[in-house]
């Protein structure tokens, strides 16, 4: 076996007009680092082509801040095809080609030419040389081998065994002393680090649908907890305001409509608004703030769902509401603040085009304007909250960005961020106690045949696996999957998101594998978002409702990754940064190919429970009430093969007495 990128150089590609391009990420390398970066990129290429390609790569580095190797991108749109149309020596090798192409197609990817799937910087891999080599390796991969991918670089095929993972991925796993924005930015430019976000570098993105069920759950539970809405009612007659219509944030208007709310989402990028409108993910578009609020108000009066995209800056939108005494009941933000100085947050007063130009021409001035805008953003939210608005951080590092902009007032202890911030994150208040602590999280699947009828069959099968009488969450999830087809959620290949707990995931997974075995559907890829019960450690989001001090520890995510490796998931991934930024999270995920075999049944019975209950156990040990209840029940029902260590809860009066005597 011999892998080589090319025998002749491919022609330089034609870039399709109108397809979004990533901004200049900034070139800050020293001459010595630049030399290394060029040599790093050229090591993928036979030496006879170096003289021609070295200047080309130098130009990319200087003008884009990265070497992407545009010449090696295949022509056209990389739409995911049916698994049968891919070459490969094992089903997993073909299946992961489906997933990669889906991550990079024009309908899905934020910046397709720069391999960015979503979240401003979340890449499948670093460059097109890596993409081509990964595809070659996947075509050669057998059941006795594992492909190892390190920050986008395919290290090679290594002998393993059929019940081992076929692909193991890590992204941006930087050594602690260098695990910061500055050193990461240098490593990215040098071509040795890839920001995989979550499902971008983990090859498991399914379009904005991937977050829409979680957003739906968050909004519905926020309404129940903060607005007093009964369990059997939705958000009709209530207003939700936020920002962002990107790959993840674009789920907000769709989720709000499904939840019955009136919703206004601000977005500075007209292209993103146009995309979401054409996809049916937002109902109305306006650049007039008064009109946006009027449309929402009229829908509220009629108890009708409504979603409005406001083309403009969210700071202006909120200041208008504060000036005009408009009541906003639920408020959040989903700008990409994990990359706040790299274009993820557009300062008030700048158009999107001015933002892009300033990023290239004067990064320091751009940074200054971001800080000024964040401080304004904080002040207007503070005024709205004082008037009764419920604001929640959507886990995008928004409050951390405000803190970093110099606003110490936002920290809970007034000194640093170690005790959290004055407003809750959605995990801290809603998703943690109401979903994660029970084991509910973003389970998903992809019908690898590409057939819509397979998706309809799996929807029906999943629905039949849910006991609506067990918990309120189960009824919500049942209603979600019942209405999924009607809500037109698919963007890209045929996929579905469905929040489920450990037993629900295992039950559905085994049912799907049985359906494949019987020939009722084609092969199915199972997976989840890294943003899950066990998959991510981040005090700024996923573990923000863990209060025993371990919210800063990453043992859970690493153990989840290692456990999924040991149990034979088809793909396992571990990343740095997630949705909150480098150094702020460790996150992992998996992919599992259902081929109908009994071998897969055995893996599912072990791995699906571990993937969830390891996180529930950790949350239980942190003395989270619902996680303790769930763990105790699990010990009773699965005591033959499992046992979760349960905490003894200290008496508060005893502890308080000792503390007061200090």
What residue ranges belong to the model's regions?
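Structural alpha-beta junctions
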Residues: 140-145, 260-261, 327-330, 383-390, ...
